[in-house]
Amino acid sequence: MEKMRGHVLAVPFPSQGHITPIRQFCKRLHSKGFKTTHTLTTFIFNTIHLDPSSPISVATISDGYDHGGFSSAGSVPEYLQNFKTFGSKTVADVIRKHQNSDNPITCIVYDSFMPWALDLAREFGLVAAPFFTQSCAVNYVNYLSCRNNGSLTLPIEDLPLLELQDLPTFVTPTASHLAYFEMVLQQFTNFQNADFILVNSFHELDHHEEELLSKVCPVLTIGPTVPSMYLDQQVKSDNDYDLNLFDLKEAALCTEWLDSRPQGSVVYIAFGSMAKLSSAQMEEIALAIGNFSYLWVVRASEESKLPSGFLETVDKDKSLILNWSPQLQVLSHKAIGCFMTHCGWNSTMEGLSLGVPMVAMPQWTDQPMNAKYIQDVWKVGIRVKAEKESGIAKREEIEFSIKEVMEGEKSKEMKENAEKWRDLAVKSLSEGGSTDININEFVSKIQIN
């Protein structure tokens, strides 16, 4: 067996938005001579489509819900506690399994939502690095909230002017979000004791916020974690995310349809793998987009929320509704004019990295703050204004926002800014770029001497 420079065990939080970026980081490490093993819970392993040719090894661990996953847990706190109990035991089993091999595990890269993994790393004498899947700005606000025992004072010094509506939702928790709020705060309980802090961003994008975080502890930005083919092309065969929780049959249909559309003419609408819009909000979107050519991804579980008879009225020559789309292929297609997004960090990074202006419709978690930066800091889009009482964005506001991004007074500026961020993303990952330097620093310090 080939002796590698070291062996990194990557332990993501078990949801697709956390699994994907840490897996992409594994590909970068593998390209630099490291063996990488990526853990997946048994339930997720049994439900994903995994590329068998991937160079990344997979090890299964347990969250205590091997047959039903998160949805079979009685509550969020129950799931998190059982994941800690069963996860720490089964991750330890993975480490022991490799101890006497030619490539024993030397480092754990773990999701920042799992601070218990640091204790596990120390128990086995391993290098440890939490992986923060959100932006430097969001991480800094969450850190301040933790430092101040869950409270924040606005405005926040050294950050753009933030209003309550711009803050991550877990910073102002409701009873239903309390477990998530505690999970967000727990990221910072022991992170200063780790050997490295890894953040899925790139220096040029939020260098000021990176500097603020670095005053607390040293930070290495190692993003964007978008497949190399779309950016720097340094990692061979890194053409896509190579795992997905959804059926891939519609990919060819999607690409074929986009090929038939004029350049920059299509509004791409997608709200990620978890966001659940109300029926009222789905109706407002449906009524707002009738004058546009659009590709709208509506998960099968959300279809019942569409207005009665709406699907029958869609002009199939001009528009397309699918349950799933190959998002990177879509965003990189010349037919796409803008991206209407929930502003999850992965989707936001994809939009920025592929140079696509955005219509921001944040739902929860870090998304409101990402939307703030999309509009006011990176200047690549517009945030759709929702009504204060209902929280619903009305059809007129949605239609106006799409028009502004597609053809409004600032449309040209937004497109130019989007292209600028795309170029900077490519530069950061290319040889000698900020992210490339940071990854090289990381691997030089964890390699076996």
State where each predicted segment sits.
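Glycosyltransferase specificity loop/lid
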Residues: M1-N449
